Amino acid sequence: MKPLKFQPLLKSTIWGGNKIIAFKHLDIQQENVGESWEISGVPGNESIVANGEMKGKSLNEVVAELKESFLGADNYKRFGNEFPLLIKFIDANRDLSIQVHPNDEIAHKQGKERGKTEMWYALPCEPDAKPVSYTHLRAH
């Protein structure tokens, strides 16, 4: 199988900027693009294949068709037909809004199959920019 290329899903946000469009050399007019979802199996926001014989199919359709040969046997057994990662570019032109993602246990209580797993790549930023991450917050 040849490598798959996916159409990006551009997300405008209140904190987004214009670096993603320039970085990806896109010829579009969209403002405040804070995220470009490169690979997503999130229902309702699934990546669409842009090339080859799978062109036009969603990522989860590809997984459902190719099963273990696409994800590997262990991953397919664990995640089924839903691709388990969300991979995206972030352009935070301002401070981000608070992001809260449930773990698997909390997601199950909310009727969802699993928590949200992401991978981010932050585009080049201003010299004085500082990343902030709060993990394992608990109510007092």
PLM regions: where:
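Transition-metal
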Residues: M1-Y134
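Conserved small/polar residues in nucleotide/adenosyl-binding loops
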Residues: T135-H140
